Amino acid sequence: DVCSSDLREEFNMLPWWEWPQEFKLKNNKFLNSWINKKSEEILIKKLIQWHLDEQWCVIKNFAKSRNIKLIGDLPFYVSRDSADVWSNKSLFSIFKNGNLIFQSGVPPDYFSSTGQLWGTPTYFWSKHKRTNFYWWRKRFQRQFELVDILRFDHFRGLAGYWRVNGSS
């Protein structure tokens, strides 16, 4: 998201929960004012993203013409400090102030006798269900535009869904 990228730069690369309140909470009045103020910089970033996307399409088409499959990696969880979480807080187990309600991990198993704490917000599945999993569908759709084969990393996060208190 170009807007979150520009805000991150403006606020010295701080995570979104350390931004001023009006931006942390995505106050539309302040965001619209910001977008108007920074319209040229935002347009430049959008053009750069478009150009990179076009270059990727050339690479993908070249690979396809030589019967080469491109493999991508889609993480099950997204970073707490991602544009996805900042833009869609209601879909994640996160308080408006950025603190985690629940965080991800896996219980003890043969890889780790103590389990693993991944530190990423878990999902509010009921909210995803209400949107017919729109966020997920768009996420997969975009990845399949970029690659031919997609590895879902870590499927264990779905098959053995586990969450712990966010303050753990």
Model-derived segments and their meaning:
Residues 74-82, 117, 156-161:
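Active-site-proximal loop/turn and secondary-structure-junction residues that shape catalytic pockets
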